[in-house]
Regions:
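A short alpha-helical cap/connector motif
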Residues: 1-195
């Protein structure tokens, strides 16, 4: 959902750690998250990594000074093989990749499906949820004791008592690993640990 990341300001301010990094997996698609986190990184003197499978955001945001753009085949493979090499902890993680629903104006859905297929990725809700869970499983050992995970496109279904969408498997995984839901609404959920 557009601009969900902006709901995290108060929680981010509680976990600032200049020795840790901020990371988004899924660079912005004209919704402003990459610029927003870049600005937070600048203010709080932290490194910021924006991980994506295409270089669209990197090409659009050449003016950003605090963003380390990472282009890879999949966020889960990068977090499994390359994240450990950084030798860094993550205090802020934003998960908003593998879009399978609503797209910004100007992006052709058929072209996205073809691009996913070219990379051997099935464009489906289930595959999206598996990818986000794999990313979180890989990131969890690198999360600081005081940290925030922001899950976009993950609404809570009141009548069913469940989370749906991209991070529907991530939320319970984080809860059994010491995280607490501190915000749900506007099509997303924010979890913190140690705050």
């Amino acid at each position: 959902m557009a601009h969900f990341h902006t709901n995290s300001s108060e929680y981010i301010n509680q976990v600032i750690d200049t020795n840790a990094i901020m990371m988004e997996i899924g660079s912005d698609r004209n919704e402003g998250s990459t610029s927003w986190f870049d600005n937070f990184a600048k203010i709080h003197k932290q490194e910021f990594y924006s991980v994506d499978v295409i270089d669209d955001a990197e090409n659009r945001h050449t003016h950003l000074e605090n963003t380390n753009f990472i282009i890879c085949d999949a966020g889960s493979s990068w977090t499994a093989t390359e994240l450990p090499k950084l030798n860094k902890k993550i205090n802020i993680l934003y998960l908003d990749n593998y879009d399978w629903g609503n797209y910004p104006v100007g992006i052709n859905e058929k072209n996205i499906i073809k691009e996913y297929a070219r990379r051997g990725v099935d464009w489906s809700t289930f595959e999206c949820q598996k990818e986000h869970l794999a990313q979180m499983v890989n990131c969890l050992p690198y999360m600081t004791d005081k940290s925030v995970v922001i899950c976009d496109d993950t609404p809570f279904i009141d009548h069913a008592g469940i989370y749906f969408g991209k991070c529907s498997a991530v939320v319970p995984y984080l809860c059994i690993n010491g995280y607490e839901v501190v915000f749900k609404g506007q099509n997303g959920v924010i979890l913190t640990r140690g705050v």
